[in-house]
From Swiss-Prot:
Entry's family note: Belongs to the class I-like SAM-binding methyltransferase superfamily. MenG/UbiE family.
Coiled coil: none
UniProt keyword list: Menaquinone biosynthesis, Methyltransferase, S-adenosyl-L-methionine, Transferase, Ubiquinone biosynthesis
Lineage, broadest ranks: Bacteria, Pseudomonadati, Pseudomonadota, Gammaproteobacteria, Pseudomonadales
CDD domains reported for this sequence: AdoMet_MTases
TM region(s), chain numbering: none
Catalytic activity of the protein: a 2-demethylmenaquinol + S-adenosyl-L-methionine = a menaquinol + S-adenosyl-L-homocysteine + H(+); a 2-methoxy-6-(all-trans-polyprenyl)benzene-1,4-diol + S-adenosyl-L-methionine = a 5-methoxy-2-methyl-3-(all-trans-polyprenyl)benzene-1,4-diol + S-adenosyl-L-homocysteine + H(+)
Protein name according to UniProt: Ubiquinone/menaquinone biosynthesis C-methyltransferase UbiE
One Pfam family per UniProt: Ubie_methyltran
Annotated GO MF terms: 2-methoxy-6-polyprenyl-1,4-benzoquinol methyltransferase activity; demethylmenaquinone methyltransferase activity
GO BP terms: aerobic respiration; menaquinone biosynthetic process; methylation
Sequence positions that bind S-adenosyl-L-methionine: 79, 100, 128-129
Known role: Methyltransferase required for the conversion of demethylmenaquinol (DMKH2) to menaquinol (MKH2) and the conversion of 2-polyprenyl-6-methoxy-1,4-benzoquinol (DDMQH2) to 2-polyprenyl-3-methyl-6-methoxy-1,4-benzoquinol (DMQH2).
Length: 256
């Protein structure tokens, strides 16, 4: 559980990075972070991952099983990397919905994809992952890439994703996770808490947002815990694949 109670009448709290904040404030604080970083989000992704995020996303697409005519939901779709690829895969008879709770990220994604000529089979929706505004049994595939760690009630979000999937539909969760060896873990800590905020300061003049992003990664459930959460939410055949020594993990579950 993410929340904590300090007394019977106290509002539940949850983590915002390493800080505990009232649950009602987390979404607003996360929104402020992504309003701040939206304009240079793609540039920072390339700089901070050395371009590796493109390989991680490519692997997710390969495991998605998406094909012509499918309906895909890309949650926390941000600037549209996955949506662009899925748009090509589903073709004119399919549909991709790019959903993001953050209006700034959604605008950047819409503008970027329109500039690239991606339209026709793509819809943009501002939506909360915990309360997805879509019918039951609607999508063949749901993805959430580097977004689940920012969700306040992850269990609610996973159940919401299960609800909108068709039976046999796939959920893919691509997220930063826990390195699988001590050497990588130490190097990753140094990188996250020194280099990431420094680059944030130099490129976006915002070190605090990138400090939060580093902290949010550490507070995210590890590979086995997230697998158990997906099973508890109702997913079947849940597996995960570690990438870059566990820095990133791709979880996949099927709706029974």
């Amino acid at each position: 559980m993410n929340d904590q109670r300090k007394g019977s009448d106290a509002e539940p709290t949850t983590h915002f990075g390493y800080k505990n904040v009232p649950e009602s404030q987390k979404a607003e604080k996360v929104a402020e972070v992504f309003h701040s970083v939206a304009a240079k989000y793609d540039l920072m992704n390339d700089l901070l991952s050395g371009g590796m995020h493109r390989l991680w996303k490519r692997f997710a697409i390969e495991l998605s099983g998406v094909r012509t005519g499918n309906r895909v939901l890309d949650i926390a779709g941000g600037t549209g990397d996955l949506t662009r690829k899925f748009s090509n895969l589903v073709g004119p008879t399919g549909q991709v919905v790019l959903a993001d709770i953050n209006a700034s990220m959604l605008k950047v994604g819409r503008d970027r994809l329109l500039d690239l000529g991606v339209s026709g089979n793509v819809e943009f929706v501002q939506a909360d992952a915990e309360k997805l505004p879509f019918p039951d049994n609607h999508f063949d595939c749901v993805t959430i890439a580097f977004g689940l760690r920012n969700v306040t009630h992850k269990e609610d979000a996973l159940r919401s994703m299960l609800r909108v999937l068709k039976p046999g539909g796939r959920l893919l969760v691509l997220e930063f996770s826990k390195p699988t060896n001590k050497l990588m873990s130490k190097a990753y800590d140094a990188y996250s808490f020194a280099f990431m905020p420094l680059m944030g300061k130099l490129v976006t003049n915002d070190s605090e947002s990138y400090r939060y992003l580093a902290e949010s990664i550490r507070m995210h459930p590890n590979q086995e815990t997230l697998k158990s959460m997906m099973v508890d939410a109702g997913f079947d055949r849940v597996t995960y694949h570690n990438m870059t020594a566990g820095v990133v993990a791709l979880h996949r579950g099927i709706k029974p």
